[in-house]
C-alpha cells in the first residue's frame, strides 16, 4: 500500500513539474512565467523529499524557490524600464577611484588564491575526513562545505554579494534620477 501511495505521489509531482514547465514556456506574461517557475522548483523540492533527501529538498526551497525566484521577479521589475541613451552616461572622478580600489582588492584576492598551497590543504583535510564518523549526511555535507569545498563556497558567496551590491546601485540610481 505504501508503494502505491508513493507512486501516486510521484505521478502528482511529475504532473506539477510538467505543468509548471509548460507555464514557464507558454505564458506571455513574464510574471506568470516566474510564478510557474516557482511551482516547478517547489515540485522538484517535494520530489527530493519523496526520494529521502531532506537536506536537498530544503536547499531547493531556500535557494531556488526563495532566492532565485525572487531575484527573477526583481530582474523583471527592473527590465521593464524605458531605454536610456548611452550619451547620458558620464564618467566622474569617483568612478575612477572605485575602479582603482576594486582593482587593488581583486589583485589581492587573486594573489592570495594563486599563492596558497591548496594541494597540501586538500590532502590534509581528506585524511581527517576519512577518519571522522558522521551521524548524518547533513553533518558530512556541512563539513565538506567548510573544508574541501571552501573555495567554491566562498566564491559563490562573493558572487551573490556582488549581485546584491549591483542591485542596490541600480535601485539608488533610479531613486536619484526620480527626485
UniProtKB/Swiss-Prot annotation:
Cell location: Plastid, Chloroplast thylakoid membrane
Keywords of this entry: Chloroplast, Membrane, NAD, NADP, Plastid, Plastoquinone, Quinone, Thylakoid, Translocase, Transmembrane, Transmembrane helix, Transport
EC number: 7.1.1.-
Transmembrane segments: 8-28, 30-50, 58-78, 98-118, 150-170
Gene Ontology, cellular component aspect: chloroplast thylakoid membrane
EC supergroup of this enzyme: translocase
Segments forming a coiled coil: none
One Pfam family, short name: Oxidored_q3
Source organism, top-level taxon: Eukaryota
The keyword Signal is assigned to this record: no
Membrane topology label: Multi-pass membrane protein
GO MF entries: NADH dehydrogenase (ubiquinone) activity; quinone binding
Principal place of residence: plastid
Catalytic activity, reaction form: a plastoquinone + NADH + (n+1) H(+)(in) = a plastoquinol + NAD(+) + n H(+)(out); a plastoquinone + NADPH + (n+1) H(+)(in) = a plastoquinol + NADP(+) + n H(+)(out)
UniProt similarity note: Belongs to the complex I subunit 6 family.
Self-association state and partner proteins as the record states: NDH is composed of at least 16 different subunits, 5 of which are encoded in the nucleus.
General function of this protein: NDH shuttles electrons from NAD(P)H:plastoquinone, via FMN and iron-sulfur (Fe-S) centers, to quinones in the photosynthetic chain and possibly in a chloroplast respiratory chain. The immediate electron acceptor for the enzyme in this species is believed to be plastoquinone. Couples the redox reaction to proton translocation, and thus conserves the redox energy in a proton gradient.
Protein name: NAD(P)H-quinone oxidoreductase subunit 6, chloroplastic
Taxonomic source organism: Chaetosphaeridium globosum (Charophycean green alga)
Classification of source organism: Eukaryota, Viridiplantae, Streptophyta, Coleochaetophyceae, Coleochaetales
Gene that this sequence comes from: ndhG
Amino acid at each position: 500500500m505504501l508503494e502505491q501511495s508513493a507512486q501516486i505521489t510521484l505521478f502528482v509531482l511529475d504532473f506539477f513539474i510538467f505543468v509548471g514547465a509548460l507555464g514557464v514556456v507558454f505564458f506571455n506574461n513574464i510574471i506568470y512565467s516566474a510564478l510557474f517557475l516557482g511551482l516547478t522548483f517547489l515540485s522538484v523540492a517535494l520530489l527530493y523529499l519523496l526520494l529521502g533527501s531532506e537536506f536537498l529538498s530544503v536547499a531547493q526551497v531556500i535557494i531556488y524557490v526563495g532566492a532565485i525566484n525572487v531575484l527573477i521577479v526583481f530582474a523583471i521589475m527592473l527590465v521593464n524600464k524605458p531605454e536610456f541613451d548611452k550619451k547620458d552616461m558620464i564618467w566622474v572622478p569617483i568612478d575612477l577611484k572605485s575602479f582603482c580600489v576594486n582593482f587593488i582588492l581583486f589583485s589581492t584576492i587573486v594573489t592570495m588564491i594563486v599563492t596558497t598551497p591548496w594541494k597540501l590543504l586538500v590532502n590534509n583535510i581528506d585524511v581527517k575526513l576519512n577518519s571522522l564518523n558522521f551521524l548524518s549526511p547533513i553533518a558530512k555535507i556541512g563539513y565538506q562545505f567548510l573544508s574541501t569545498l571552501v573555495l567554491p563556497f566562498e566564491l559563490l558567496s562573493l558572487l551573490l554579494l556582488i549581485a546584491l551590491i549591483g542591485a542596490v546601485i541600480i535601485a539608488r540610481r533610479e531613486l536619484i534620477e526620480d527626485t
